[in-house]
């Protein structure tokens, strides 16, 4: 068995540089010399502690939002704060006999950026931290720095923000020329300049010279004093900049005094700063359509859902046909506030709680896991649609921003046409059995359908006694109302069989009824044999089929001759028809028995057929 070596990583906020960088410390060296086991000799299950130096603030995501300035994309590329630029400017002033510049807005201060980065490890030389902007908006800050237009602004809270430039030189010029030394540093610089000027005056008084020379020396003294003042001012100011002290601004902004310094990486927006903002409550929150006052979480969720729906409807052209191929650029991140539809807060606290509970239930219902069966039987495939809308909850995340790209892509994706549904195997078997039963019933009905074999069904006919019809025709009297037959037996419709066990004559003989639409009855021809009007029922013509197949004669004489001539052949036809009817009746009874057997089957019994076997193979 190979030895198992464990590793334990401990994150420490402050750790010595030696162990963090992997350098051997004296304690470790002494431990190794004392005979501690080497890595190859570590026993099984032993843990080794490896310290890792990592700041916890670096793990926190950056929630700052940038407000871009359209006029801040210009860069000069000239460093006027360098020593070479200042020396050239002084030489040019001496050449043309200019006095030293006393204007604080155009001071010559040499700044060593490498020294600044060493003194302040996390400094951002292209960014200036400003505090005291309680009543100022984003446009007010941009207009305040219009002489040095910045690139964008990062708001930290109601009282402070970071103003960012595209280069370090412009930010340094703005900080030095738009701010001054603190009051204590000014006093120190004045004291130093006064001491040096007093010493030089004493030296000048001790020297004896002519009046012309004194005048010239006086001019030189003035120049030297001014040079000394500039040197001391730059030295004190450089020390103040190295300490990164807050510098008061030269001009007021809306009656407030601003203070500025170089920003550092620790100057970040705190979590939940937007909810605690008094400026948003007083002047309106631009992230929510400029609404003033306290905004509840339910109101924010409704606002975000409406905003996303409006973006999908109005800006559908920005999203390609294939979602994900074209990137969606959100246009609400700029400074210009898009006019939004105000949403009034009509609900009270109780109604808001109810809505939050309903939304949580809806979200839980939307998050259900479902399984899709891709191959199903054709009878089971039904068009079902399901639309899922995901809502972003502001209470779960402290940041006020949303990933609009992700939300829009998820909403714009079409819902699947096939519904995803989880079913049990027993349900599938039962559905297959139902389909098989329905198909068997359809086959049995179609096979035993008499209408399809014989022909189209005649319109509903009313049967009456032939004798009454013949008597009425003869007497030219008004016909009686037809007698309704309650019996619907097939034997009455087809007539009696030729070898019927019943007696030929009875006290109340059953007479076969014929339709009133018979051709012979319409022509008024009596249908009787030579034996008499009331002959045996065996010799009578059968049913509706004979009346449909037989052709009526043009004259009465021809009709009587043809009836007498075709009497023996008609009996043979009747026997054939009766046999066919008997076969059909047997088939119908057999189909009923099959259906009764299928209905009595248990619900989980499986019948193997071609359709079921092919469906199972497709599913496998």
From Swiss-Prot:
Location of motif WLDD motif in this chain is 155-158
Name its GO BP terms in alphabetical order: 7-methylguanosine mRNA capping; defense response to virus; mRNA export from nucleus; mRNA transcription by RNA polymerase II; regulatory ncRNA-mediated post-transcriptional gene silencing; snRNA export from nucleus
- Compositionally biased intervals (Acidic residues): 209-230, 341-365
One matching Pfam family: NCBP3
Q: Which UniProt keywords apply?
A: Antiviral defense, Cytoplasm, Isopeptide bond, mRNA capping, mRNA processing, mRNA transport, Nucleus, Phosphoprotein, RNA-binding, Transport, Ubl conjugation
Where's it found, cell-wise?
Nucleus; Cytoplasm
- Record-listed Phosphoserine modification sites: 25, 73, 209-210, 415, 620
Q: Where is this region: RNA recognition motif (RRM) domain?
A: 126-187
Composition skew (Low complexity), residue ranges:
15-28, 611-620
Q: Which family does it belong to?
A: Belongs to the NCBP3 family.
Matches recorded under Gene3D superfamilies? 3.30.70.330
Question: What function is annotated for this protein?
Answer: Associates with NCBP1/CBP80 to form an alternative cap-binding complex (CBC) which plays a key role in mRNA export. NCBP3 serves as adapter protein linking the capped RNAs (m7GpppG-capped RNA) to NCBP1/CBP80. Unlike the conventional CBC with NCBP2 which binds both small nuclear RNA (snRNA) and messenger (mRNA) and is involved in their export from the nucleus, the alternative CBC with NCBP3 does not bind snRNA and associates only with mRNA thereby playing a role in only mRNA export.
- State any GO CC term: nucleus
- Cross-link Glycyl lysine isopeptide (Lys-Gly) (interchain with G-Cter in SUMO2) mapped to chain: 12, 70, 186, 541
- Recorded protein name is Nuclear cap-binding protein subunit 3
Sites where Phosphothreonine occurs are at 413
Give me the stretches of Basic and acidic residues compositional bias: 185-198, 366-388, 459-474, 511-521, 554-569, 585-598
Where are the stretches annotated Disordered? 15-42, 185-233, 332-419, 436-620
Care to name a GO molecular-function term for this sequence?
mRNA binding
Question: How would you summarize the oligomeric state and partners of this protein?
Answer: Component of an alternative cap-binding complex (CBC) composed of NCBP1/CBP80 and NCBP3. Interacts with SRRT, KPNA3, THOC5 and EIF4A3.
Organism annotation = Homo sapiens
């Amino acid at each position: 068995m190979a030895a198992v070596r464990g590793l334990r990583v401990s994150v420490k906020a402050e750790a010595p540089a030696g162990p963090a960088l992997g350098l051997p410390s004296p304690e470790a060296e002494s431990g190794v010399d004392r005979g501690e086991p080497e890595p190859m000799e570590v026993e099984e299950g032993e843990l080794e502690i490896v310290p890792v130096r990592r700041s916890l603030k670096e793990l926190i995501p950056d929630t700052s939002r940038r407000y871009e300035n359209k006029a801040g994309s210009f860069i000069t590329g000239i460093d006027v704060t360098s020593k070479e630029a200042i020396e050239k400017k002084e030489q040019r002033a001496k050449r043309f006999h200019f006095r030293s510049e006393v204007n604080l807005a155009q001071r010559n201060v040499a700044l060593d950026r490498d020294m600044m980065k060493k003194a302040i490890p996390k400094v951002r030389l292209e960014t200036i931290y400003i505090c005291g902007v309680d009543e100022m908006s984003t446009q007010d800050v941009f207009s305040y720095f219009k002489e040095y237009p910045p690139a964008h602004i990062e708001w930290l809270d109601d009282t402070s923000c970071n103003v960012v430039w595209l280069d370090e030189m412009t930010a340094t010029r703005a900080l030095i020329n738009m701010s001054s030394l603190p009051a204590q540093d000014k006093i120190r610089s004045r004291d130093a300049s006064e001491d040096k000027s007093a010493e030089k005056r004493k030296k000048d008084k001790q020297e004896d010279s002519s009046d012309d020379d004194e005048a010239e020396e006086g001019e030189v003294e003035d120049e030297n004093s001014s040079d000394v003042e500039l040197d001391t001012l730059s030295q004190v100011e450089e020390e103040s900049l190295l300490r990164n002290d807050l510098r008061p601004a030269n001009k007021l902004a809306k009656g407030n005094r601003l203070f500025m310094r170089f920003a550092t990486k620790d100057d970040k927006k705190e979590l939940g700063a937007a909810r605690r903002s008094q400026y948003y409550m007083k002047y309106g929150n631009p992230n929510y359509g400029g609404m003033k006052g306290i905004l509840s979480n339910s109101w924010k969720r409704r606002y975000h859902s409406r905003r996303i729906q409006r973006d999908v409807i109005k800006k559908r052209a920005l999203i390609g046909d294939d979602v994900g191929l074209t990137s969606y650029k959100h246009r609400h991140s700029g400074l210009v506030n898009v006019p939004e539809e105000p949403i009034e807060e009509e609900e009270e606290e109780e109604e808001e709680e109810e809505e939050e509970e309903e939304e949580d239930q809806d979200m839980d219902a939307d998050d259900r896991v479902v399984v899709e069966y891709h191959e199903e039987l054709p009878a089971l495939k039904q068009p079902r649609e399901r639309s899922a809308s995901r809502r972003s909850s502001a209470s779960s995340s402290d940041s006020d921003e949303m990933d609009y790209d992700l939300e829009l892509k998820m909403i714009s994706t079409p819902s699947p046409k096939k519904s995803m549904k989880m079913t049990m195997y027993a349900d599938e078997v039962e559905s297959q059995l139902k389909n098989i039963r329905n198909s068997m019933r359809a086959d049995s009905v179609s096979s035993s359908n008499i209408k399809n074999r014989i022909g189209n069904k005649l319109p509903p006919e009313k049967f009456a006694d032939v004798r009454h019809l013949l008597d009425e025709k003869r007497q030219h009297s008004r016909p009686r109302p037809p007698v309704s037959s309650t019996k619907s037996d097939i034997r009455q419709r087809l007539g009696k069989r030729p070898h019927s066990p019943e007696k030929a004559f009875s006290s109340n003989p059953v007479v076969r009824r014929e339709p009133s639409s018979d051709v012979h009855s319409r022509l008024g021809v009596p249908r009787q044999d030579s034996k008499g009007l009331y002959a045996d029922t065996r010799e009578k013509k059968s049913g509706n089929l004979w009346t449909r197949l037989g052709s009526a004669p043009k004259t009465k004489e021809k009709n009587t001759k043809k009836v007498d001539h075709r009497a023996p052949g008609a009996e043979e036809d009747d026997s054939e028809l009766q046999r066919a009817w008997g076969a059909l009746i047997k088939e119908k009874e057999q189909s009923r028995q099959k259906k009764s057997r299928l209905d009595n089957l248990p619900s989980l019994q499986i019948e193997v057929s071609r359709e079921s076997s092919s469906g199972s193979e497709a599913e496998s």
